[in-house]
Each structure stands twice: as structure tokens, then as C-alpha cells.
């Protein structure tokens, strides 16, 4: 399991030490990120620590850091996250923007915006507007953006990591890969 440090509230080394003190066996993820921690085992529920509840980190796959790193948002920019729930990438963008600028966190599925809103608040993101539009409507609804993130859940990689039967079923793997818009 991996977690992403919320730099709006803490530093990775401080978070790591706090979790180690609670009985969590972890280490920083490689040189390509300064916010990721790999959790190997824990004597406490990682999604219920005081640090988690106060928004010091997000449970998030390390691969989900990459779209935001590639986007490279800069402070004071106007950013659209097209498929934002549950908010891992949106809150990562907010941290990189240092809570400046504005992020339009969109999810076409209105029901999913509940978890998105909860995470935005928990992590202390003050520059996020949560919305639920069909992406084709944005040109009609609001002006341009400095950056747009569309990490569409199309490749099935999340499903593959959670369902081992997909790994051995070539037909299912081909079905999932055919959905990729990349």
C-alpha cells in the first residue's frame, strides 16, 4: 500500500516519523517523488490514524502520482481535473499549487462527488470547486484553463491490480485494454 503526503499540512519525514511511532513499517518511495511512502505492514488501520483523519495523507497508488507530476501545475494556475473522484489527484494538484489558483474538480457521476468533497475538506484544499458536468459542456459553462487533467479510468489497470483473475484471463485483459483512450 502507498500513501501520498499532503504537503499542505506536513512534510514527508514528519509524517513518516509519526506513523513509525504508531507501529507502521514504511519507507519513502524512490527518488522520483518527494511525497510518497510505501507501507509494508501496520499495527494500526492506515485509513483511521489521527494523521489520516486530520488530512496529513491520502491513500493513493504510486502510479496515480504520475499524471499530476506530468501535468506539472504551477501556483496561481487555473486547472481542470475532468475525472476527479475520489480526489487523490485533485488534492495532489492543490498541494503543488500551494492552495493558490483554482482547481475545478469535476466528476460526471454526481454520486462520486461526495467522497471527492470529503477528501478535499479533510486535506485542507481551499482552492477547489467541485462540480459534476459532462466534460463536453465545459466550453459552454466556463472559460479556458491553464492545464487540464483527464486521467480517464479506462485502461483497467486498477481493476487488474485488484482482481488477480484478470491477470491470467487473456480475453478479459484484451477487453479491458480495448477501453483505453490514451
Label each residue range with its predicted role.
Residues 1-182:
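S-adenosylmethionine
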Amino acid at each position: 500500500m502507498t500513501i501520498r503526503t499532503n504537503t499542505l499540512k506536513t512534510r514527508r519525514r514528519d509524517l513518516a516519523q509519526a506513523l513509525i511511532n504508531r507501529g507502521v513499517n514504511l519507507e519513502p518511495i524512490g527518488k522520483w517523488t518527494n511525497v510518497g511512502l510505501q507501507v509494508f505492514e501496520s499495527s494500526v488501520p492506515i485509513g483511521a490514524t489521527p494523521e489520516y483523519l486530520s488530512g496529513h495523507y491520502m491513500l493513493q497508488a504510486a502510479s496515480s502520482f504520475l499524471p499530476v507530476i506530468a501535468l506539472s501545475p504551477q501556483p496561481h494556475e487555473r486547472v481542470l481535473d475532468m475525472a476527479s473522484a475520489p480526489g487523490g489527484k485533485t488534492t495532489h494538484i492543490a498541494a503543488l499549487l500551494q492552495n493558490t489558483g483554482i482547481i475545478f474538480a469535476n466528476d460526471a457521476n454526481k454520486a462520486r462527488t461526495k467522497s471527492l468533497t470529503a477528501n478535499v475538506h479533510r486535506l485542507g484544499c481551499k482552492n477547489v470547486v467541485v462540480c459534476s458536468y459532462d466534460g463536453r459542456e465545459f466550453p459552454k459553462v466556463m472559460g479556458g484553463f491553464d492545464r487540464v487533467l483527464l486521467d480517464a479510468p479506462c485502461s483497467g489497470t486498477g481493476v487488474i491490480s485488484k482482481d488477480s483473475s484478470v491477470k491470467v484471463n487473456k480475453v478479459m485483459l484484451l477487453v479491458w485494454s480495448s477501453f483505453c483512450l490514451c
